[in-house]
Amino acid sequence: MNLFSVPNSLAAAIASFGFAVLPALAAPDRAHVVNVYAWSDYFPPSVVEKFQAETGMHVNYTVFDSPDTAETALSVGSSNYDIVTMNASPHLAREIPKRFWKKLDQSQIPNARNADPQILKILGQVDPGNLYAVPWMWGTVGVIYNAEKAKSILGLLPAESLDLIFKKELAAKFEKCGISVLDSWQDILPLMARYLGQPQLSAEPAQLAAVLKKLEEIRPFLRRISTSGYYEQLADGELCLSIGYSGDAMIARRMAQEGGTKIPVDYAFPRVSVPLYIDSMVIPADSPNYAGALKFINFMMRPEISAEVTRFIGFASGNAAAVPFLDLSMRTNSIIYPPPEVRARFETERVYTSDELRTFNRAWQRFRTGE
């Protein structure tokens, strides 16, 4: 999951609330500092202020622009971070065996019992026994679109929303109003593989070649390949169609209404399968403030706090007890909380070998640069 990077419209808000969007720094009394490494608005200013006021601890908030960046920073050791948000697959799946994270003292985080059972069960596939990670936010990957533009260009939408971008004949119709896809092979390559009827993304030459050929066909029609800022462009009309995250669809919709463009931003789930991402709170193995990190997790898993975050960013909470604290309109919003028939199509990534990772990374770089 994904999601965001600085700069974005919320970075200034974060900075204005008195906690740092800076590299994590040591403090004279480290027991009173919690260094957080996360997406830019996963812990909004309001909830961080409440945590600081209640505990007397100071939060340094460092923003990353991709889980790969975070993984690289953590792999060198001595990161000085206490809390990190990380996606379940593929990152946690390969990091837990490498001892990136510290086991959680469940007695210190009683609010972790509020976790959504379905999400916790899926997370357990990469964290057996749920020993290391507490689910924070989750969502899906799908097609975000300007409903007004789509109707004027096509009339009725295709049954498979991915056709809008993955079929070159349809992508050509939307080229002028702007198409984007996520700059994330972990999201796009498996999605294209399933779209083509493959059971999963494979490095087998013929299967991978088919995936890349189909992507190369639509490459000329893409205005942007990015995981950050695309939701702002959907809100202001610079883009009309994107493969993106469900939470970003909600942000784009809100920005369009609050910003005055009133663009009707909508979201469609893929029919072939629905990619699910789960971002969790984890504690680095070398955290200097393990006790403070546990207090942070327990505080954030309070139902009313988790609900406040969901209201702010529009992502589904991994905290089932938070749902009753949401407005009816948000609880019943199918983009945030998909209905059972969509949940039945949830899929998460498998764990790739080192050779596969290198193959997919190289293939994606060639695609994104148009080589």
Regions found by a protein language model. Give the residues of each.
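Early extracytoplasmic/lumenal segment of secretory-pathway proteins
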Residues: 26-95
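Mature extracytoplasmic/periplasmic domains
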Residues: 279, 284-345
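Paired acidic/hydrophobic, glycine-rich loop segments that form the ligand-binding mouth/hinge
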Residues: 81-86, 223-224, 240-245
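Extracytoplasmic ligand-binding site segments that recognize negatively charged/polar headgroups
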Residues: 87-92, 96-221, 228-235
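Conserved C-terminal helix/tail region of periplasmic/extracytoplasmic solute-binding proteins
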Residues: 340-371
